[in-house]
């Protein structure tokens, strides 16, 4: 049994062709248990309008984005296994996969890995942080049987 509880929310209009719950569970299980014990993650799949609104509200960016991470911060003295929420925009993920000539499944997996690392406190604001985070993403993706998501940038 998985140590990561997944709450999958399908808030996008078209559900056709989306990864299934088992795939999202596999991707979470590939990253989170390496860093902490039992936890719960909500993954909400949204359309561009919701992604755009959230990205503008929380990041000041006036466009939709691939993944937003919202870590849960429990009040002092309360311990809960809730790690946080990932908001993933279907259209942006599909467009990026096509533009970057990546298999769609691999790009979905990468967005879950990338967002999960943000929930765990990793970031890519400065070069050192970015290098560490990208290295972890690559290691995790390779362990799950996918290619290095940054291979095109390294060539």
Swiss-Prot record:
GO terms for MF: metalloendopeptidase activity; RNA endonuclease activity; zinc ion binding
One GO process term, biological-process aspect: rRNA processing
CC per GO annotation: cytoplasm
UniProt keyword annotations, A-Z: Cytoplasm, Endonuclease, Hydrolase, Metal-binding, Nuclease, Ribosome biogenesis, rRNA processing, Zinc
Lineage: superkingdom: Bacteria
Record InterPro entries: MetalPrtase_cat_dom_sf_prd (IPR023091), YbeY (IPR002036), YbeY_CS (IPR020549)
Protein name (record): Endoribonuclease YbeY
Gene encoding the protein: ybeY
